[in-house]
Amino acid sequence: MAEALVDFHCHLDLFPDFEELVRECDAAGLYTLAVTTTPRAWRRNHNLASATRHVRAALGLHPQLVADHGDEIALFEALLPETRYVGEVGLDAGPARFRSLERQREVFRRVLVACASAGDKVLSVHSVRAATLVLDMVEAHLPRGRSNVVLHWFSGSKAEARRAVD
């Protein structure tokens, strides 16, 4: 059995040599999910990744950017049919982002509803200091079997981790 390496959450487009990194990941056989932070960044990532065997682009709206880019949720919803992969999305209730938490919740709810409607999505979900809230929202808006969720930046308890696995 051949071994394969997977990086399920990498912000390749935040590096100055983004295009070269995509080529290097592909040449090395490193399966990479290139998550985006805004829907406007997705097209460039998708175009580069679609020319590779090992790199895929994910459509995202990062919770840390929702205060300034939350209006891009309509663009997110419009682009969603073009991809199976979604990330980075979620909630960040850390001190620096707590003021935008209600807006984050609304955006994340719309992401989950859109993914539930489309089905067969794979989500990379940011969950800083918000594990219970993230799990509550996933359970409420993304019925089991409609998509798969991987928690990223999980800072929850053991009980929350068990709940996520169950």
Could you say what each language-model-derived stretch is?
Residues M1-D166:
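Mid-domain alpha/beta scaffold segments of enzyme catalytic cores
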